[in-house]
Amino acid sequence: MANGVIPPPGGASPLPQVRVPLEEPPLGPDVEEEDDDLGKTLAVSRFGDLISKTPAWDPEKPSRSYSERDFEFHRHTSHHTHHPLSARLPPPHKLRRPPPTSARHTRRKRKKEKTSAPPSEGTPPIQEEGGAGAEEEEEEEEEEEGESEAEPVEPLPPGPPQKAKFSIGSDEDDSPGLPVKAPCAKALPSVGLQSDQSPQRSGSSPSPRARASRISTEKSRPWSPSASYDLRERLCPGSALGNPGPEQRVPTDEAEAQMLGSADLDDMKSHRLEDNPGVRRHLVKKPSRIQGGRGSPSGLAPILRRKKKKKKLDRRPHEVFVELNELMLDRSQEPHWRETARWIKFEEDVEEETERWGKPHVASLSFRSLLELRRTIAQGAALLDLEQTTLPGIAHLVVETMIVSDQIRPEDRASVLRTLLLKHSHPNDDKDSGFFPRNPSSSSVNSVLGNHHPTPSHGPDGAVPTMADDQGEPAPLWPHDPDAKEKPLHMPGGDGHRGKSLKLLEKIPEDAEATVVLVGCVPFLEQPAAAFVRLSEAVLLESVLEVPVPVRFLFVMLGPSHTSTDYHELGRSIATLMSDKLFHEAAYQADDRQDLLGAISEFLDGSIVIPPSEVEGRDLLRSVAAFQRELLRKRREREQTKVEMTTRGGYAAPGKELSLEMGGSEATSEDDPLQRTGSVFGGLVRDVKRRYPHYPSDLRDALHSQCVAAVLFIYFAALSPAITFGGLLGEKTEGLMGVSELIVSTAVLGVLFSLLGAQPLLVVGFSGPLLVFEEAFFKFCRAQDLEYLTGRVWVGLWLVVFVLALVAAEGSFLVRYISPFTQEIFAFLISLIFIYETFHKLYKVFTEHPLLPFYPPDEALETGLELNSSALPPTEGPPGPRNQPNTALLSLILMLGTFLIAFFLRKFRNSRFLGGKARRIIGDFGIPISILVMVLVDYSITDTYTQKLTVPTGLSVTSPHKRTWFIPPLGSARPFPPWMMVAAAVPALLVLILIFMETQITALIVSQKARRLLKGSGFHLDLLLIGSLGGLCGLFGLPWLTAATVRSVTHVNALTVMRTAIAPGDKPQIQEVREQRVTGVLIASLVGLSIVMGAVLRRIPLAVLFGIFLYMGVTSLSGIQLSQRLLLIFMPAKHHPEQPYVTKVKTWRMHLFTCIQLGCIALLWVVKSTAASLAFPFLLLLTVPLRRCLLPRLFQDRELQALDSEDAEPNFDEDGQDEYNELHMPV
């Protein structure tokens, strides 16, 4: 029985026998005769004769039908005659074809004449793709074998015994197939018809020489059943075993291969993977024929070159976009993949009732789903670095891997594949479908499963394992649906992203790679089947995602509905894991499934489990956020430790190398502008060298529409304070300086500072502290009978001297010692002054125009004037009208109306009405809008008198009869006393304190790292310019200016470009700031041109300016931590907010700190209200050593860090708070 087979049980007819001759006569030297005999044997006519003489099969005759059990018995029988494929392969040196000779051409021509007989009508000849047939190539190979006998063979290098090796390619296809004939073509579709297999041989048989030649070739490669079978050669890239191999198509998995013998494995490979002519499954495009011409000597060169130049895998982590698709039924009860959730950083779910996206939130996962996910990845298929570029190709390999890993049955192959290729729908499809929605029509199942041929676009190793056409109709997806094969399938090509959301696409980073999660219940599976896929490179799978983002990861989970697995929660779990930064970095760098399991364990270490108890109120979850922050901190520390250990080892982990380099470059390029050099004017020189080289770009960067919008916005933001402070300054100085002088000063100094300053984004202007100093100095000059404007000239000259000395000594570093303790006292004091001045002015209006039961006629106004003169301060010039009816009430209405409108628009900015940009525009123009509305109200009431703003006509001083544009330094009306020329150094030092604090703190706020200014700043240069220009202002009688904190921060925010690729729910991030000088020049120029609007400015009532003053004072208080702690004194401890100064400091010690600040404010208020009001800047400066020397003796460092820390970062959210709440500085 060695040459036959044992019949299977049941008395069935035996399988066809394969006869192999054991003894053959020796070979002769005549090669030509051998070729002739071989040509007669392989002639096409012989195939026709063999087929025609085969007895016909009678379908009515009863015969045995073989089951799978019979074939299994046949495969495992020890008597199965077997010829290994490796015995049929030509030696490696035969791959190099010798150049054709004349003798070979003659033999080929003679062979062609002999085999040109027409075949029989039974079976037409079947030729392979890529030429006129395979016969010529087989003939050439046999001729080469004959010629090689006479050629010397190079001896192989000594080494271990050669094992049996298998390969799929041109070599195997050109060699003779395995001579086995199966009884049923449907069960074994890979059976081929061979001339030597027929049980009835007709015609001339091959000569003994030809058969001996073949046998000698087999004997030269002895085969032993005990030869080892190298499983690594049967692995394909992306297989569950994780090892890349040269083969793309494998007959079985590793577990089955270990249980079978080498003969069975070889036979399975022949049946499943060989392309046997005669029983055609699909055309195999041979790489040798595609790449090079037939008979080309360099046919294999491109393949070898391509293998050598294999692309390096990209393991660099990218940004992530995750989409969860679930298998659902539509209205017509047809299955399709429906998007139910997505992740960019936080989870967004589709609301079932409204089909719209919900708000982003932190994903909450069940602990059981995480454990099931870990078990699924451990037991399921893991295909890493899969080299496929289409969804059908990926689906084919996923299904085959599921079959190999025994997750699904082979008969479920078609159903699972159809399920994976179903169409995908998204919530935005119906909205963006247009007039002609595209519904990709599905082809028949056979076309999808059988006609998907590998194309060169798939790459050299991108061949997809296909299924035979003759395996029968695939099972329907749903048993109740007879038309399941007409279900729409996912087909590549066409415009598949018609429903994409451009707004969502803007929020996804440019280099993001997507993860697709497919989960669902199917009725035809008996157990859940899962696969985790990582592609070798990201590919764009059309019609799969909502937006056109290349896909890198896929997770598939299918199973029956009767199991306890919650597929939705399991899909949410893997999607949340992939959106986690550390896990998706580990997924990029994973080499096998153990790395993925380790990453899941790391994720579980940083997760929180909440007990299953009812939570009533958010206050009960306060500890969760703090505990989570602590876990994240420990997690970052572990990652940092790993990076440090990796770096010490001399190499950097993939993905970490770039961050380390970037961090190092940032550290080296960072330049501290406040660092002292130790040389005279060293800081000034560094500022010039740092900032002026960017001067050309400061002009080019202004060519953008955003700069135009910023100019218009900041113009109104700068004009409103100029008018408000100008009107109040005219009141305080009795008209010596007013709106005209302040507008001119703002314009001139603004243009010069924008052109020469180191930080041109600063907006110079008048401020509340300078207004308080001007009032104090005016009262001092009136008390000493000195000329106010002449005294300001000498104060300005001394100011220049002190500024030069401070800049030469690099004194700008002192701004580091000004902590929020001093800033809050400063801002709180100025806010109180604004509020007090507002109601004080309103009181004066009610005094001048009281509410009387009977108002005298116009001729009796002089009597009323005499009666009320004692209550009014002495003034020069003609007095205004008195005792006007309804003036006080209308002034009150105008003041409160201006305040309420501006305050309401500020609150409206942070509301939920309209869009974010519209709210921000309305809120930013709140002050100009409130002024305009109240001016129109006053203009519409013509029978009531209100005091208006004093503005001259044209470019003129406020009081031409009192002063001119140039102020004589030696006095105008009388000589200025010499002692005052020297004593002016004291007020100059005081005004320097105010200018230094406001300018340097404002520059420090603008230069925060969070604002990402790239061109740098210059504290020394800016201070020198503002101080020197202050001396120029004294000579021309113009007010001193400083860097206005609120206006400067508003200017920077208006020029800030925010990143659009921000995950929903994440805080906004700055992309860049348009640092340039043109906007500052234009803003100052427009403010200067506003002097021609004198007729319009004269229509503004002073009561409207009082309302703006009240608005500035109230809004400044709302952003100061001191005011918040002041309210906590009257609040029970259980209602205190979760702030560091509350949770880390005892309540009574927190109140003690607040009381110390209130004591300093009270002392400054007392000094400001007395004759020594000029010295209040000096007392303000004393709060710095108080904080540095005294408070550390009363409080611990931990408490001071919580009470007096500058940890506030700029808020760029369109729904966030405005600049007043972010700053601790006065307006």
From Swiss-Prot:
Which residue ranges have biased composition labelled Acidic residues? 134-152
Q: Which PANTHER family match?
A: ANION EXCHANGE PROTEIN, ANION EXCHANGE PROTEIN 3
Q: Where is the composition biased (Basic and acidic residues)?
A: 58-75, 480-497
Q: How is its activity regulated?
A: Inhibited by 4,4'-diisothiocyanatostilbene-2,2'-disulfonic acid (DIDS).
Skewed-composition ranges (Basic residues): 76-97, 104-113
Its cellular-component GO annotations read: external side of plasma membrane; plasma membrane
For this protein, the record's InterPro entries field holds: Anion_exchange, Anion_exchange_3, Anion_exchange_CS, Band3_cytoplasmic_dom, HCO3_transpt-like_TM_dom, HCO3_transpt_euk, PTrfase/Anion_transptr
Spell out the PROSITE patterns in the cross-references.
Answer: ANION_EXCHANGER_1, ANION_EXCHANGER_2
**Annotated Pfam families:** Band_3_cyto (PF07565), HCO3_cotransp (PF00955)
Spell out where the chain crosses the membrane.
708-730, 736-773, 793-815, 825-846, 888-905, 921-941, 975-997, 1023-1044, 1078-1123, 1150-1186
**Known function:** Sodium-independent anion exchanger which mediates the electroneutral exchange of chloride for bicarbonate ions across the cell membrane. May be involved in the regulation of intracellular pH, and the modulation of cardiac action potential.
UniProtKB keywords: Anion exchange, Antiport, Cell membrane, Glycoprotein, Ion transport, Lipoprotein, Membrane, Methylation, Palmitate, Phosphoprotein, Transmembrane, Transmembrane helix, Transport
Pro residues: compositionally biased ranges? 1-11
Molecular-function GO terms, alphabetical: active monoatomic ion transmembrane transporter activity; chloride:bicarbonate antiporter activity
**Region feature Disordered, mapped onto this chain:** 1-256, 286-312, 428-497
Task: Name the domain of life this protein comes from.
Answer: Eukaryota
Tissue/organ expression: Expressed in the brain.
Q: Which GO terms describe its biological process?
A: cardiac conduction; pH reduction; regulation of cardiac muscle cell action potential; regulation of intracellular pH
Q: What protein name does the entry list?
A: Anion exchange protein 3
Q: Please list where the region (Membrane (anion exchange)) is annotated.
A: 708-1227
Q: Which residues carry this modification: Omega-N-methylarginine?
A: 294
The family classification in the record reads:
Belongs to the anion exchanger (TC 2.A.31) family.
Q: Which reaction does it catalyse?
A: hydrogencarbonate(in) + chloride(out) = hydrogencarbonate(out) + chloride(in)
- Cytoplasmic side stretches: 1-707, 906-920
Q: How does it sit in the membrane?
A: Multi-pass membrane protein
Q: Which residues carry this modification: Phosphoserine?
A: 167, 170, 175, 198
